[in-house]
């Protein structure tokens, strides 16, 4: 069983809200505990969060809002999640830095990859906020881009309500089966929607592995980081 030295953890915005609009403190506290366990195990970790518990640009666009403006609103929602997670991590004694793609000098550092790497080398958690800082990019793609630029060994995609990648939506199709292993080419060819296809393609081109797993039970993040085989491992093949 082999572990990782530096990981990028992708968390959905819906997870922060516990299925509702806003931030659920109990959920964020649980996630912070899990991340603290990873840090205490000596693993370097960076995090990208979504903002779907506040805004989704594509959905607001369908209701008539300008997509660019809606996406920027989503980026601000992501920063709120970052600050909430930072607060709970620091209450646990974990040094944390938030870096944002849009300058917000009073609450976060600007996104500087070399500084992010240095923070992780010092044992700090780095939380990347405000997406890519540009509209039309999903946080899935941002997670992969940040992982590549900060030289992470793997992208860990933590999911709520599903424990890996399936042939179809297991909540809708009782015949759906879970993949233990998968290649990016297969994921793209099958049209699997666990992450967007741009993220899959970017990982595949750069041979960056991804593990898709469920957040439950508590402790799964540490298990994955330490090399335990849970969820689905996606590789370039």
UniProtKB/Swiss-Prot annotation:
Its EC number is 2.7.4.22. Inhibited by UTP. The keyword Kinase applies. UMP binds at residues 51, 71, 132-139. Keywords: ATP-binding, Cytoplasm, Kinase, Nucleotide-binding, Pyrimidine biosynthesis, Transferase. One of its GO terms (molecular function) is ATP binding. It holds the Pfam family AA_kinase. It catalyses: UMP + ATP = UDP + ADP. GO terms for cellular component: cytoplasm. The keyword NADP does not apply. GO terms for biological process: 'de novo' CTP biosynthetic process; UDP biosynthetic process. Homohexamer. This is Uridylate kinase.
